[in-house]
């Protein structure tokens, strides 16, 4: 798999997740670095569309990159599922704690829900980061597909401009 999507070993990931105060910041840094690296990678692939010899090589590169991103996306979705499981467990625990042990009586379920969300703000923020990054990865796949389809158009344009047939 590409170095861009090096997510670390399972132990490294678990270690990162246990460091709560620094965990979200590390996640933000990890996501931001992946975004920056992919921005550079997409620009490099776009630049390869400028010349025909590079365009021919580009097709093979694009297929490999798409597979890397799809594999990464699948891994990321698995992590999101684990995070959602953790969220649901914690939400249930918070709900039970408020309903059974709280000294405060909440007038509505909406008030209870707001209190739970306030108590779980860190986990909600982490889920939001995961969701935003998943959307970014999906858009990256679409961009790579767009470049792949641009290859054919680039070759056709070159044929029109030069009158040369490529085989």
Model-derived regions, located:
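Glycine- and charge-rich intrinsically disordered segments
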Residues: 1-30, 167
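Non-transmembrane, amphipathic alpha-helical segments
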Residues: 26, 30, 61, 65-68, ...
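Short, charge-rich amphipathic alpha-helices with coiled-coil/heptad character
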Residues: 37-71
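Generic structural signal for well-ordered, non-membrane alpha-helices
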Residues: 40-43, 71, 78, 85, ...
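Short, well-structured hydrophobic secondary-structure segments
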Residues: 57-94
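Extended, amphipathic alpha-helical coiled-coil scaffold segments used for oligomerization/tethering
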Residues: 81-128
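Long amphipathic alpha-helical coiled-coil segments
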Residues: 85-95, 124-157
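Acidic, low-complexity, intrinsically disordered peripheral segments
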Residues: 158-167
